[in-house]
Amino acid sequence: MSRPRNNPQTSSPQDSTKDGSSFHYFQGRFELSGKSRQYPADALEPQPGIGDVKVIEKATKSMLDPAQRSHFYLVTPSLVFLCFIFDGLHKALLSVGVSKRSNIVIGNENKETGTLYASKFEDVLPTFTALEMSSILRHCCDLIGIAAGSSDPICTNSLQVQRQFKAMMISIGRPLHSESADLLISYNAGPAIDWINSRPWVGGLMFTFLFGEFESPACELLDQVKVVASKAQMMTYYTVRMFLDQCVDGSTALPAVVLEIPVFEQKKPLAKKVLGDFFEFGGVLRHPVIGVLSPQMFPNLATAANYWAKRRNSTFSGFEALDIIPGSTITFPVLQMASAQKISRGSDMDPYTLNILRGYGISGFE
């Protein structure tokens, strides 16, 4: 005699998990309180400070000395140098929560002080040589990495910074200092770049730097910042734009890429409308609308564009982008095969792909 078959709607393992009933098996086996061991009170992250504005010259002169500099949290000297160069920055930093007091390095103890200058300057107002001034400007030029969003792309001794500093020294009439202003060459700007970039107010700071009016030499310094800031942190957007305009191989017609072309083309005018004339600086200003142009919004298109750019354009050879954007479904073998073929422009192309490429004028389709 045949037995009746179980009703799959009532006995399916998949269905029984919908209300969590199958997990009763695990409940009660490991009963934990949910609490966790906490960090001790003295394990707070060290913080930089900028001292009192009345003694910023004393603090700056003191921080030129490596021995004095070594007593303080790594970011403190960089902030002091910036406050020395840019009048009014000290007050602005205090207004966004930067402390006057800085952590100091004393063994493993976590202590702080508001006195950032050496005792020998207690009753002396220091003066600065031209070489000292240029060295401070050189360090501030290193801090251009703030615009790049990280200390990784721009290192103290990178050729990019050297070129920008040389251009700045020529513009202020001190070309010889482009080589000799090295008093701070061993002081790494990286910690300050990353610390400032982690602050919620970094977008406001960059807006002031980029669009404020400054006299020399701050003006010439910020001219170099603008060179880096223009299109910074938006490289993937410009890579995709170039890919769609110039690529003539089969990778633009990959189905996964074609599906995301309308997404990219529709998000672009939204960002431009919100940012207006500031669009090319949107990444540096950390405007939230730039998120609509994140490569995660069109991962297959961004992956194909990065692959194409790194192979076809030497400008992008050092572009540090992920080879495969998270969320992408296309693979390198697929890209390799597609890029080895010229894009079809005949009747063999499926209507949807043809309409997308024609509709958005991709790769010269009309």
From Swiss-Prot:
SUPFAM superfamilies: P40 nucleoprotein. InterPro entries: P40_nucleoprot_BD-vir (IPR009441), P40_nucleoprot_sf_BD-vir (IPR036260), P40_nucleoprot_sub1_BD-vir (IPR015969), P40_nucleoprot_sub2_BD-vir (IPR015970). Disulfide bonds: none annotated. Expression detected by RT-PCR in a few cell lines, including OL, HEK293T and MOLT-4. Not observed in HeLa cells. Residues 1-15 have a biased composition (Polar residues). Residues 1-22 are annotated as: Disordered. May act as an RNA-binding protein. Highly homologous to the bornavirus nucleocapsid N protein that binds viral RNA and oligomerizes. Bornavirus is a non-retroviral RNA virus that does not generate DNA forms during viral replication. Therefore, integration of EBLN-1 must have occur through a mechanism relying on an endogenous reverse transcriptase activity. This is Endogenous Bornavirus-like nucleoprotein 1.
